[in-house]
Amino acid sequence: MSWQPELDELRRRQAMTREMGGADKVKRQHDGGRLTVRERIERLVDKDSFREIGSIAGKAEYDSKNDLLHLTPANAVMGRAKIDGRHVAVTGDDFTVRGGSADATIKEKDLFIERYANQFRVPLIRLIEGSGGGGSVKTIETTGRANVPGVRGWEMVVNNMGTIPTVGLGLGSVAGLGAARLAATHYSVMVKEISAMFVAGPPVVNRLSPRQFDKQDLGGWEIQLRAGAIDEATDTEDEAFACARRFLSYLPSSVYDVPARGPVTDDPDRREESLFDAIPRDIRKVYRIRPIIEKVVDQGSFFEMGKLYGRSVVTGLARVDGWPIAVMASDPMFYGGGWTADACQKVERFVDTAQTFHLPVVYFCDCPGFLIGLEAEKSGVIRQGVRAMSAMFQTTVPWCSFIIRNAFGVAGAAHQNGGRLNWRYAWPSGRWGSLPLEGGIEAAYRADLDAAPDRKAKMEEIEERLNKLRSPFRSAETFWIEEIIDPRDTRRILCEFVDVAAPVRGVGPSTHWMRP
């Protein structure tokens, strides 16, 4: 006797769950400009690589003879797959089934995929829409009680932050636990126009606020990108999937591996003549840092993260001679490159990511210090600043720093882990000290200036005298700066750095686990 009847029943049940919330709900999803969860997974991963786990989990309806009438799937689809040939775990919310809320959730599925990714040491991608399995008021009626708030399994979400790359894609409105799951990642993306993210959505907020909000007003992509709650926003879902794939391409599968070298596609000895005069002599003039980064890393490899948040610091991943690196750079277009409170938060999180996944850090420093003034003090910039510095000083990954213009004050000192040996270079445009002369002279020579018959002339005299003494060559004479280089040699030095750094990258968990 064969087992064909049981296999037929299995196929029948799988066919029911693949209908998701039904034709009407699927049409509504498409009419809203959004893909279904199964379409999303198909477009995200390598062709034919997805293997679903829990394919017939859901809520079953039986007749009086205990024969199955209908099977409504759980509102999460999950499984294993491959991206660029590498094993990953994927979970996606099915918004066509009760909007992704708790009363259609089988919590064990969420717990399983988090544990699966952790124990098999593979990256995890969450496709999030709705409340992500979070609570609904209807749950009170269906369970007959009100639950004391708790997030079962959150300890595994925390553990995964220190163990495997996690990516979150917000592909519709996400609220409550869904928003938390999106934020608790190393890299997160929203899709413009169709995505929104909030602790509580407009129906809740509008009951309590005199101002009435729609989804985009309250938690649209631009709000969340500027707040640092997400890392990127794209025009389409397919672009979001491409961002996820590209982000993962720079990282190992887990902390128990090192980032793999990619194809060598660029000449390590390439010299960019435009770097020779990239930094203006006039310190009042600014310049654009991104073209400088793009000229020294492998062509087309720079992948920026968090562009609209903490804008005085640029962060991203790149390749140098095929090796993945983490790149930080000051952006003088915003606050002259000074560290604001949000820039410090951005640096802390980025450095922690590099440390967690064994990425060498390259920093192009042009930092005049922390932002000063009343608003800066009210933002708590000094506490955020020392948190960023602490993250840097806790790193064990190799560092290579280039002081391309300013390095002043406490924030300027945070251009490397001062407790470890690092590669450090200065361009001829480098200038450093406790304070920039432009502000420091007034404080240090106030008595001389007050006593001078011509205050302006005295100021110019002191400034001219000190300018000669602060030459980078004076610092190099005493080995305060290890080497001054021709800016056009920067790429060659970087290629040598990553080659030397590659064998000393360790594996395993960081000494301190990363937090979102």
Model-derived features: where do they sit?
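Ligand-binding clefts of soluble mixed alpha/beta catalytic domains
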Residues: 1-516
